[in-house]
Regions:
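Secretory targeting and sorting signals
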Residues: 1-30
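Ligand-binding clefts/hinges and TM-proximal coupling segments of bilobed small-molecule sensing domains
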Residues: 30-41, 45-46, 171-191, 267-303
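Extracytoplasmic small-molecule ligand-binding "clamshell" domains
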Residues: 33-120, 285
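Extended ligand-binding regions for polar small-molecule ligands
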Residues: 34-38, 84-85, 89-90, 149, ...
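Bilobed "Venus flytrap"/periplasmic-binding protein-like clamshell domains
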Residues: 65, 76-89, 142-198, 203, ...
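Acidic, polar ligand-binding/catalytic clefts
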Residues: 94-158
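A ligand-binding cleft/hinge motif common to bilobed small-molecule-binding domains
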Residues: 121-128, 175-179, 212-247
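Periplasmic-binding protein-like
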Residues: 138-145, 229-268, 289-303
């Protein structure tokens, strides 16, 4: 869920309303994590009138731990949940998370259903045709395999001829295409990509032996390896050729280009969180310090 998520073709308004309805649930009030965060006057003043006095609606694929998942009371929790609560506090408002299939999140903004896309969504040049991104995270992709690593996987370069799973419509699909081309260019068998609807589906494919490995966002892969089955289900593969993950990129809050005032307000809020130390505190809380950005940029990805 950066899942560094990347949509191969931008979803347009014409996506069926029936599809949106079938892949979304009602709003969920996020467990509050903004205690002690004070309103930033400049950021709050920049928030456009139409977004004041009501919660900001966030489209997000849940679960995608540690970024967003449900606690025992089915309240959304996770780093991105905490961050959005803190952003909202800086703006003097609230947020509501709405569970949405990843490949319909952009369409949900275009239809007016949601205001923000927050789901470990990669800031890509292609997406920038439709959305502006306030970047708050930088991460790559990593592999997890069955615990014990029975196939002795050392990295993408050793997976020629194997089946690797990932989430459909994710950035990792293109990473696997590139790795597969490297295989075939070298006269080896291609990598078979098993693209599945959700993070849970991809995990289950590896556990069931339908895929040798799962390529996911580095932070999610590390968390899954540590937590799933109390650490007994999966193992993180650290590739010596890419110790920090494959093709690191920026992740951000997605906002429709038409809502440039909202983008500016969120950028000011994130900058304030970085300045007052809240941002670093939240990263440390989720053991994600290595994925920090130095400043709140808009559309930081240039190619």
């Amino acid at each position: 869920m950066s899942k560094n998520k990347f949509v191969s073709s931008i979803a347009l308004v014409g996506v069926s309303a029936l599809l949106l309805a079938a892949t979304a649930t009602g709003p969920a009030s996020a467990a509050s994590s903004a205690s002690g965060v004070t309103v930033d006057a400049k950021a709050a003043a920049a928030l456009p009138k139409q977004f004041k006095n009501k919660p900001l609606n966030v489209g997000s694929e849940i679960p995608y731990a540690p970024m967003e998942f449900y606690d025992k009371n089915r309240k959304p929790v996770g780093f991105e949940v905490d961050l959005l609560n803190a952003i909202a506090a800086k703006l003097g408002t609230k947020v509501e998370f709405h569970e949405q299939a990843f490949d319909t999140i952009i369409a949900s903004l275009q239809s007016g259903k949601h205001d923000l896309a927050v789901s470990s969504m990669s800031d890509t040049v292609e997406r920038q045709r439709v959305l502006d991104f306030v970047d708050y995270f930088q991460g790559g992709a990593s592999l997890i395999v069955q615990a014990g690593n029975p196939k002795k996987v050392t990295g993408l370069g050793g997976l020629c001829g194997a089946t690797v799973t990932t989430e459909a419509a994710s950035w990792e699909v293109d990473v696997l295409k590139g790795a597969s081309k490297t295989c075939t260019d070298a006269g080896k068998a291609a990598i078979t990509t098993l693209a599945l609807p959700s993070d849970v589906d991809a995990q289950n494919a590896v556990r069931a032996g339908k895929a040798v490995a799962y390529l996911s966002d580095s932070q999610a892969a590390a968390y899954t390896a540590k937590v799933a089955g109390k650490g007994k289900y999966f193992q993180l593969v650290v590739d010596p050729a890419a110790p920090n993950g494959y093709e690191s990129g920026l992740i951000g809050v997605g906002v429709l280009k038409a809502n440039s005032g909202l983008t500016k307000a969120i950028q000011l809020a994130v900058a304030s969180l970085i300045s007052d130390g809240t941002y670093t505190k939240l990263l440390k809380q989720w053991n994600l310090e290595s994925f920090a950005v130095a400043k709140a940029t808009v559309n930081g990805t240039k190619s």
